[in-house]
UniProtKB/Swiss-Prot annotation:
This is Probable deoxyribonuclease RhsB. Residues 16-42 are annotated as: Disordered. Its main location: membrane. Disruption phenotype: A double rhsB-rhsIB deletion is outcompeted by wild-type cells, restoration of rhsIB restores normal growth in competition experiments. Restoration of growth requires the RhsB-specific immunity protein, rhsIA does not restore growth. It comes from Dickeya dadantii (strain 3937) (Erwinia chrysanthemi (strain 3937)). YD repeats lie at residues 486-521, 569-605, 612-647, 766-799, 847-879. SUPFAM superfamilies: Tricorn protease N-terminal domain (SSF69304). The chain crosses the membrane at residues 48-68, 70-90. Belongs to the RHS/WapA nuclease family. Its EC number is 3.1.-.-. It comes from the Bacteria. It holds the Pfam family PAAR_motif.
Amino acid sequence: MLNDILSRVARVGAMHAGNRPNPPADRPQPCQGKPPTSPGKTIKHKSFLGALAGAVAGALVAAAVAAAAVFLVGVTGGLAVAAVGALAVFAAGDLISAVTNKVSAVVDSASPAFGPVASGSGNVFVEKQPVARATKDTVACTKHNSPQLIAQGSESVFVNDAPAARIDDKTVCGATLKEGASTVFFGSGQGTYLEIADEFSWWEKALLIAVEFLVPPSRGMLKGLGKLFTRNGLKSVLKGAKAGALFITKVPGKMGCAARAFKANKGMARFKEAAKAFKKDPVYLASGEVIESRTDIELGQTLPLVFERTYRSASAHTGLLGRGWHDSWSEVATVTHDGLNTHVVITLAQGYDIDFTFHQDVQAVYCPHYPEFTLHRRGDGFSLWHRDQQTWRDFSVVQGERRLLSAIHDSHDNRIELVRDPKGYLRQLRHSDGVTLLLVWQGEYLHQIQRIDGGQKTLLAEYRQDEQGRLVEANATHAYHLYYEYNTAHRLTRWHDNDQTWARYEYDAQGRCVYTTCADGFLTARFDYLPDRVVMTDGLGQRSEFGFNDLHLMSWEQSPLGHITRYEYDEVGNLLREISPAGRVVEFTYLDDTGRVSTFTDGSGHQWQYDYDDAQRLCGVTDPLGREWGWVYDAEGNPERLTGPDASEVRFTWNRYGLLTQVSDAAGEVQARLQYDHRQRLLSATDAESRTRQLRYDRQDRVVQWQRADGARFRLGYRRASWTLPEQLIRPDDKEEQRQYDRHNNLLSYVDGNGALWRQTFGPFDLLTARTDAEGRTWRYEYDRESQQLIAVTAPDGSRWQWWLDADGRVIRERDMTGTETHYGYDEDGLCIRVRNGEGDTRHFLYDARGLLLRETAPDDTLHYRYDAAGRLTEVSSATAHVQLDYDLRDRVVREWHNGTLLTRQYDDAARTVTRTLTWDGDADDTTGTLAPLTSLFHYTRTGELRQVQLPDGADLTLTHDAAGRESLRTGGSGFVQQREYDVMGWLTREQSGAQHDGRLQPAQTREYRYDGAGNLTGVRHNRDAEGYRLDATGRVQEMLSGGAGKPVDTTARFHYTRTGLPQEAGRLTEWQAGRLVQHDDTHYQYDRAGRLIRKQVVQPGYRPQVWQYRWDSRNQLRVVDTPNGERWLYRYDPFGRRVGKRCDQKAEETRYLWDGDQIAEIRHYRHGQLIQRRHWVYNGWELVVQQRQHTGGDWETDFVTSSQNGTPQALFTPDGTLRWQVPKATLWGQRQTEKSESPDPGLAFAGQLRDSESGLCYNRFRYYDPAGGCYVSPDPIGIAGGESNYGYVQNPNTRVDPLGLAGCAMGEILADADKWSLAKIGDRQKGMIKDKLSTVKERSKALNTKMREHFNANEQKIISEWEKQTGMNWPTLSSGSRATPHHVIPIKNGGSNEWWNIIPVQHPHTGTIHGTGSALRTHLPYQKDGGKLWNLLGY
């Protein structure tokens, strides 16, 4: 139901809860993330920016390349679980990805605003503005006139357990977040956490690049509502309206359509703009109509076979379903004659009419108001061409003046035949893919739709009408079951689902809706239709006003706080200019003869240009920097080649049905191959390393088996006929997982491989109201009645996290579970300009005309930001730091200067290598020659796994992978070897490391792993010692056991947990207050009003108390540590929040760090100002694989590192395989039993953690972790998106990590699940990169999530292309011929990045086990810990 509601634009809003801005804390590496967005920041619609889609070339390209696959999700049904993998979206290659990202990101950020981000984190701020989060926060979308949840966000940064929403992320309604912070960047990579309404048809998505200013009515976005509801009146209009005829005279050689002059309350020229006028459930303000739109059936592998129905309260039309209802199969052409002129009115499924006038001998007519449509004469009938969907509709069945729809087909001759009886009644639909539907009638109306091909007789939908011919019951058997009620005027007065969701409407004498309300008081509003405006008063008495022009397009809108946004159009309704409340302006120009966008100008005057071929297809895009992207199409209109600014190419091969079969580069190297069965369903996908995934289907085209490249098979079971979501999964190890859904596709329960049960409860509009874990702990969620934004979360112990909204729905105050409060302020455009923490420290933010952050002013420092014309960050400066960034043509950072250090990267795409060089100022003066720049060469496989690293001293490390793409062998130096073995589930079971002699490994270290049915680690054998774990139902450690060969089994530790999940070890005193550790044995903790640790005191009888003092800056960065022995340590950070140095004057010691992204690449130790030692680190993902040490004047010592599953280094081996160092024993939470010495010890703890001996803490990128207490010492920068506890570490440190100090996740389990469902093998390199970013996994604000989602949508193709380039594989294609869906491993909502390494191809992103309840990811990173509909959208 949620999906449906979302599509209706009306209630999408904040349904997914969680609308708190995220405090900016530290930022991800420059340019590897995106500026987070905040309440007030503008959003943009691709639909509105149809032409802008071209600007979003990147994402478009990817879509284009994957044309056939994009539609898969809707076509094949929710078989996602099994296919959720490699077949998702066939990327066009690195080129496309580069193009896509660039153009799309640029365009998204520059596109016109269609409302502001409405809410953000209540306790996380960036540049003093609440950080918006995906799945939690909403936007005030003017296109939909209702709160829309942010669907995308960072894949690596989470705020309050939600992915931080950033520029270019999208909302559920398809809008793109366009403005964000100017100095802060959150996690690279973009994750999609909520279903995004399709703003473009499958073809448009395939060629989003087409820069079309429209959003065809495919599955999604109002199911076509906001898209073609530009004409909201009755069909009665003036024939041959002169307006259209006059316009046509401007187009030589073409006879235009006579645009009908609609009556006063009707007629919007462009559906994109019309969508802005939808409010509440939804009500179309321009006319006062109530619109109810649903898609009951979606089938077909090539050409979509869709049954969409739309009710319009002012319509007199009678379709298959009854009075007032339009539908996909009742589309009709009505013909009249006027002298030599023939007038044809096409009535489409969404209930709008398009009027064409044929003059004598004219065979084709173009409509300027709907330039995507062209009508052709065909004998006595007509054919309607939709250029964006690349489909024809034939109207050839003659019934008087009417021509009934007889067929739908495309340029590949994929066809849907509508078979009618002599009276014109539709009896069957026959699809060339092999699908046959039978229509059963009851009297004059449609009663049932059955699928009868293959000997089946499956009921897909059933309808019932009353005696007056009004639809009163509609049962789409795979989803919702709805009931309708009408008044005496036959207007819809109420609909309900016979459960908890309903909506009610009241009308005035003119038939306009004047009042609406929904279940539990949601979406309540009263409408007043004044001569010059429409006034909407919501349930809280807050007043919004809207003005419309002569075309009934919204010309201005005023928010409850009085902020006015204005829109200007041309004579046919194309948006020319949008002016924000603060005066920010974006502009568009169009081609007269096609309506295509020709230029887009952002708020700073930078312009993008678009070129089209004779077929009106986008063939070129030029950005403000002069970079050009070009597309070439084959004779059938399929994108055949994409060329980027650097002259690189990606080539595509298609079969006769228009399905992608191969992706290759300019040299002819194949990246991917796809094969289909006789029904055009994807059978297999083979990557560049010849690894093949296979799929099998049932008669309803549902995936019933998915086989990985290594032969492991996963079987899917469906308990209900026509149900598209699998409710049973039989794994390769024969373990069974179960899921139960309600009729709205909401996941009610999940049973994992251990039999543990998780439950969820939903309220009206499918809002998550309660979640109960396998241990019986329940979290409850509350929402704002108007915006449906999350406003409160109640933990199992009764503690609450709350947010307060202003009249515009923006979070202005937040109080976390510890009572810490944060306040936010905004400008007219909704940009956060002020954030005040609990200590009263205020940070101010200033933005440019594009909404990019220019300056961040705080009591202790001021940061300045600069960007290039494309909106890329080029420079950041503060009182103590200066950072400069250079990019290549693919937007990759190739040079980064920072206060005397330089990091350069050289990319050789043909050789698949990256050369990294680290340089320090002053080294050139070194006379010993020992301080030469450090250059490392990284080699990758064709599928993106790290294959080899060549080190500065000449040593190398080589990684080998098995048939499934998992690392199986690691060799280095003259004799080091590590071997790995996996079980049928792909879980690591054995790892041996040591020296190789005479071709045989002589292990010095052997580690064996055991797991339970849910994939939780239950035992580790290290050589002759063993350690076991007894876990509770949720996977937390309850007991630690030790033993081994000849040793008795002893219990070494027992744990129990608070109601909120915080650990307490048996026999030790641990006191938590409101989620913060206040005492652990003899150690006492004290915090300031901003929730940061300021004093730690150890009191032992007979000893003087030992006291540590901590001081923080306004950005929550630890600056000073005073130790008990009188030492004072000072910490320095760069503008991105990375610690770049620490020093102690008392000891005359200093340490400096040079970063590569979010990882330290080199460390230099100084004493008395002299360099005494340096270390060089090389990572594979979040795992340290090489450490090199050099003492002053000495040679480099190279060690190869082995690590445990949680990233903790276990041992160092010399190049000849000799064991040099082993990690000391530590507690479950990382507290070592011995202190680090001057040994080769890297000084690392869990993944992403650097131990600081002076403070006893671990630096964790964005926070500091206390291993003694097993918790953080400051609030989570991303707030509730970071988890149920603002201070807690991961649930189980054996299997989960938090590399960035933002959110913990079970990396091993998550990656295993991802690999299991990916349609393409996930290489070690990709896994490593994912692991490396897991630390950033934090729930983003709705705004940030939306930004990230928008960014992903805009750059999808580019990202896919980059994935293809980095992995060496072709993006898989589904059985439908569509490309696999790109699925984020770490969801945007949880902080996932929109980067190639964070996406995998899957069959359906919203029904995959990887993100399903009970999955490793969802177990450790619940999509909506604070509520929302993400679970539903994911099908779990």
